[in-house]
Design a protein with these regions (language model features):
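Adenine nucleotide-associated cytosolic modules
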Residues: 1-218
Length: 218
């Protein structure tokens, strides 16, 4: 069950990249958000400047009738009509980590930004420098398998989550494919449910950010 904080509910889900990973992640998110009373008003923001090509129809979640249309706009319209999700399309590219950070500042203060990802140290360093003045210890790692490994990496006893985990108001997930995305989303939900029973309600994030594109910069 997805649980959340009454004092600080999730209000935004931002997906960067609507291609092979993003196009198959968005329907999972849209269905999840609209199936719960307390998340049905969460805004699902889709960011991608690319258009649908014929070759995309073979492995991405698009059909031939959508060729030449912007991917973010196609998915936003599809799941707004299909699931009545609060979708919003941003039809332009975010070419770098720095540009991603600038865009996200429109949603939350830099000091409130957290990170959940298992990407390369180079990306982690860039993210940490943008949003974590105190360095890497301010951020959070979450593996696609279990949240116990997250606790282990942060020097905690297996199964025990540190008070610093999810202490910020946003969560960042970097996915490498649709299977990875599904694992990470489910792990996040499980972790939020676990924390609901052991942490202060103020410890919950109010935004989830999913990076399913821009693989070339990592």
């Amino acid at each position: 069950m997805l649980k959340y904080s009454i004092n600080r509910p999730i209000t935004n889900v931002v997906v960067f990249g609507c291609g092979g990973t993003g196009s198959r992640t968005v329907p999972l998110l849209a269905q999840l958000l609209t199936s719960h009373e307390f998340t049905k008003n969460v805004r699902l923001v889709l960011v991608d400047g690319d258009v649908v090509e014929e070759k995309n129809c073979k492995r991405q979640h698009f059909i031939k009738q959508e060729i030449d249309r912007n991917k973010a706009e196609v998915l936003a319209r599809r799941y707004r009509l299909g699931f009545e999700a609060r979708t919003e399309a941003v039809p332009f590219f975010v070419p770098s980590v720095e540009e991603q950070m600038k865009y996200l500042r429109g949603f939350t203060k830099p000091s409130e930004m957290g990170v959940v990802q298992d990407a390369t140290r180079g990306f982690f360093k860039a993210f940490s420098e943008c949003f974590s003045p105190a360095g890497m210890d301010q951020s959070v790692f979450l593996s696609p398998e279990t949240f116990e490994s997250s606790a282990a990496r942060n020097g905690n006893v297996k199964g025990q989550l540190s008070n610093t985990l999810f202490s910020n108001t946003s969560v960042f997930i970097m996915c490498v494919d649709s299977v990875d995305a599904r694992k990470r989303i489910m792990t996040l939900i499980q972790t939020l449910g676990y924390m609901f029973g052991v942490q202060s309600r103020d410890a919950f994030p109010n935004m989830i950010v999913i990076d399913s594109g821009n693989e070339d910069i990592f």
